[in-house]
């Protein structure tokens, strides 16, 4: 298929319908939207679809907690999600839901085809069951220690630390997220997709060279570990689609979620009379691309193409994987206000600022992207306001006042204009390969050249001298011509700024028409195209995020949910507010050796310690008497103490520090221990 005749379908991963969109989500959707808008500018037939992922136990349980039907919850969330995406100018052709008739039909069709082709197996499995809630526990409602890397607090289906996949019954020390109870094992008949049958096909797909190297390498690790049959069924109660021919079995959410790509596109096809089969038949020549995050690579690189192959449908042309978003070099934090919802951002800042910042830092690799808020302000103001928009404003005034808005009929510097046009192919290649950061750097280098041209020509000087009217018009027109080319190159990134620029230029910006300058052309009076970002806006957004997160935690819904807090969660004290590394560094924790320990007769709680710190001896009173009824046994052991705590005069003597212990109090207290070989006075780091 020639590039002039490309037919392309693009999807983003489906946001889960139980929470708001945040700036982490927006990275993927902005990345995909920039690529889609570029392809539209190139004249290709391209469709961009997405949907809410609306099935699964989490939605069922959250709706129950809220006292509403799951259908009402997902409808409300979908409306909110779509509003956020529209706010960031994400140009979906369709935004649907996996809880749709189209998705039900496709899910049943694919399942039936897989079954007819011999790729569905059934067998009884031992499954974790919550004895308190009388329900089988989905993978994501079991947590425990990863059986592979031993990372704690991992879900029942895969480890977020080492990316290993496993059965929930393999978890070490599993617990129910629903009730906190320790699950028991019960048998249930389940349906499995025979993934190992597709290993040869998947290996060939992996070796095709189309996939990102990081994806291909990760797939090879999974091949080396051995592919396993995939459990595609869940027991009732469950919110989703019932498996045909069963009474109480439902499709696992990860079976019908990617099928939602097809369902959303089918919904669009039905409304716009598009040929669906032309994009999804096995022999389709159309291009199909999925933009996803690195946390769901496994499903999209193994299960999804294998399901399509087994159902006699086409496979994706490629999956484009991105990393996570950090803020100021750290994971997004609710307490710090850096877990920023899309709706919160939109109340304080122009969405085009974030689109530009993300674009400036995006590559086609799976690298995490850091949203440094100080750099964000500086980059937006410098690049977009001081350089780009200023290029138009500093020339437009002369054109409007002195020449009635009419541009010159000849270029002042044809060679410079041609230099800008010559970069079109390179910039287009960067966009095509999703190297948006490189495209932006190339465009801003041209912007610097354009401003250098204006600075050297100094139209404000020419304007003061008689007889140089023609020169003034040509110089200022040249500045406008260069601005137009730059704005055309940035149109996929900044669609609204491009729209305002088109109104100012009174000409549409297309990739092809940029090669022809606007000679003897009338432009509109210049109006402000873009506003500077003030650091106070950032501060207000952060404070609003903190307040929103605090409100969620104290809302009636949260109180209702708190009443259902799991037994496991209620066993522990809540986390304190986050502190910085500098705050932590203020504490001087030291290893100390117990020289003597005795009960304080007049106190029911206190033991009196004499501690050797290596360089001095300290007396510490510690309220652990109930846990250590025979204090003499503590003599000679090592403990950890806070050594720089101000001495405190107590009723029974002076206490010169604090000994660290863990537990809920009373008899449930345990002194922290250290390995053999450590010396008294050693600092804990």
Curated annotation (Swiss-Prot):
Pfam families given in the database record: Anticodon_3, tRNA-synt_1g, tRNA_bind
Question: What is one term from the GO cellular component aspect held by the record?
Answer: cytosol
Cofactor binding notes: Binds 1 zinc ion per subunit.
Keyword annotations for this protein, in alphabetical order, are: Aminoacyl-tRNA synthetase, ATP-binding, Cytoplasm, Ligase, Metal-binding, Nucleotide-binding, Protein biosynthesis, RNA-binding, tRNA-binding, Zinc
Q: Provide the binding site for Zn(2+).
A: 146, 149, 159, 162
Task: Tell me which cofactor or cofactors this protein depends on.
Answer: Zn(2+)
Q: Give residue ranges for domain tRNA-binding.
A: 583-685
**Motif 'HIGH' region location, chain numbering:** 15-25
Cite the source lineage: Bacteria, Pseudomonadati, Pseudomonadota, Gammaproteobacteria, Pasteurellales
Taking the first listed entry, what is the main subcellular location of this protein, grouped into a coarse class? cytoplasm
A GO molecular function held by the record: methionine-tRNA ligase activity
Q: How does it assemble?
A: Homodimer.
Similarity comment: Belongs to the class-I aminoacyl-tRNA synthetase family. MetG type 1 subfamily.
Q: What is this protein called?
A: Methionine--tRNA ligase
The UniProt annotation puts motif 'KMSKS' region at: 331-335
**Biological role:** Is required not only for elongation of protein synthesis but also for the initiation of all mRNA translation through initiator tRNA(fMet) aminoacylation.
| The EC number(s) this enzyme carries | 6.1.1.10
Q: Which reaction does it catalyse?
A: tRNA(Met) + L-methionine + ATP = L-methionyl-tRNA(Met) + AMP + diphosphate
Which SUPFAM superfamilies does this one have?
A: Anticodon-binding domain of a subclass of class I aminoacyl-tRNA synthetases (SSF47323), Methionyl-tRNA synthetase (MetRS), Zn-domain (SSF57770), Nucleic acid-binding proteins (SSF50249), Nucleotidylyl transferase (SSF52374)
Query: Which pairs of Cys residues are joined through disulfide bonds in the record?
Result: none
The answer, when asked if tRNA-binding is one of the entry's keywords, is yes
Q: Would you kindly state one Gene Ontology biological process term found in this protein's UniProt entry?
A: methionyl-tRNA aminoacylation
The record's listing under HAMAP family reads: Met_tRNA_synth_type1 (MF_00098)
């Amino acid at each position: 298929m020639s590039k002039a005749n490309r037919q392309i379908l693009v999807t983003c991963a489906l946001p889960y319908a139980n929470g708001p969109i945040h700036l982490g989500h927006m990275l993927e959707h902005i990345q995909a939207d920039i690529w889609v808008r570029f392809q539209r500018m190139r004249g290709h037939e391209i469709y961009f679809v997405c949907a809410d992922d609306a099935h699964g136990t989490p939605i069922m349980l959250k709706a129950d907690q809220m006292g509403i039907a799951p259908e009402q919850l997902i409808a409300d969330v979908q409306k909110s999600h779509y509003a956020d995406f529209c706010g960031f100018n994400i140009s979906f052709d369709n935004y649907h839901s996996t809880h749709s008739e189209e998705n039900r039909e496709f899910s049943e069709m694919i399942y039936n085809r897989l079954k007819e082709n011999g790729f569905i197996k059934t067998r009884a499995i031992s499954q974790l069951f919550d004895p308190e809630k009388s329900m089988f526990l989905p993978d994501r409602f079991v947590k425990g220690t990863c059986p592979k890397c031993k990372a704690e607090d991992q879900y029942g289906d895969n480890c977020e630390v080492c990316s290993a996949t496993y059965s929930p019954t393999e978890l070490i020390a599993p617990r129910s997220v629903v009730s906190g109870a320790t699950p028991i094992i019960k048998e249930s008949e389940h349906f499995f997709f025979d993934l190992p049958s597709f290993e040869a096909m998947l290996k060939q797909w992996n070796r095709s060279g189309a996939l990102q190297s990081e994806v291909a390498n990760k797939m090879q690790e999974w091949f080396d570990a051995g592919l396993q049959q995939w459990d595609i069924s869940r027991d009732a109660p469950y919110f989703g689609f019932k498996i045909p021919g069963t009474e109480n079995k439902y499709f696992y959410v990860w079976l019908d979620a990617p099928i939602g790509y097809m369902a959303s596109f089918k919904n669009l096809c039905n409304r716009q009379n598009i040929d669906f089969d032309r994009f999804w038949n096995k022999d389709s020549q159309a291009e199909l691309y999925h933009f996803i995050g690195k946390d769901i690579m496994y499903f999209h690189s193994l299960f999804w193409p294998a399901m399509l192959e087994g159902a006699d449908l086409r496979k994706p042309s490629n999956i484009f994987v991105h990393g996570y978003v950090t803020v100021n070099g750290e994971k997004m934090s609710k307490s710090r206000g850096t877990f920023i919802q899309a709706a919160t951002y939109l109340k304080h800042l122009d969405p085009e600022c974030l689109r530009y910042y993300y674009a400036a830092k995006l590559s086609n690799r799976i690298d995490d992207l850091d949203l440094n808020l100080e750099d964000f302000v500086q980059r937006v103001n410098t690049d977009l306001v001081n350089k780009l928009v200023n290029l138009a404003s500093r020339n437009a005034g002369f054109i409007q006042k002195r020449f009635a808005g009419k541009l010159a009929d000849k270029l002042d510097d044809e060679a410079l204009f041609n230099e800008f046009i010559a970069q079109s192919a390179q910039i287009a290649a960067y966009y095509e390969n999703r190297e948006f950061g490189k495209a932006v750097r190339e465009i801003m280098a041209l912007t610097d050249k354009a401003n250098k041209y204006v600075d050297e020509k100094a139209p404000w000087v020419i304007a003061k001298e008689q007889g140089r009217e023609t020169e003034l018009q040509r110089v200022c027109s040249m500045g406008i011509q260069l601005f137009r080319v730059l704005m055309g190159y940035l149109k996929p990134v900044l669609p609204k700024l491009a729209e305002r620029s088109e109104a100012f230029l009174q000409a549409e910006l297309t990739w092809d028409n940029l090669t022809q300058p606007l000679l003897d052309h009338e432009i509109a009076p210049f109006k402000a195209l873009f506003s500077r970002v003030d650091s106070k806006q950032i501060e207000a957004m952060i404070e609003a995020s903190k307040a929103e997160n605090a409100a969620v935690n104290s809302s009636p819904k949260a109180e209702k949910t708190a009443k259902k807090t799991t037994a496991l969660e209620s066993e522990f004290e809540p986390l304190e507010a986050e502190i910085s590394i500098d705050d932590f560094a203020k504490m001087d924790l030291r290893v100390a050796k117990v020289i003597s320990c005795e009960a304080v007769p007049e106190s029911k709680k206190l033991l009196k310690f004499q501690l050797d710190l290596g360089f001095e001896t300290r007396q510490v009173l510690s309220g652990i008497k109930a846990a250590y009824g025979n204090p003499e046994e503590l003599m000679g052991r090592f403990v950890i103490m806070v050594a720089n705590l101000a001495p405190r005069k107590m009723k029974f003597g002076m206490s010169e520090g604090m000994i660290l212990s863990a537990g809920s109090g009373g008899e449930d207290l345990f002194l922290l221990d250290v390995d053999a070989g450590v010396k008294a006075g050693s600092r804990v780091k």
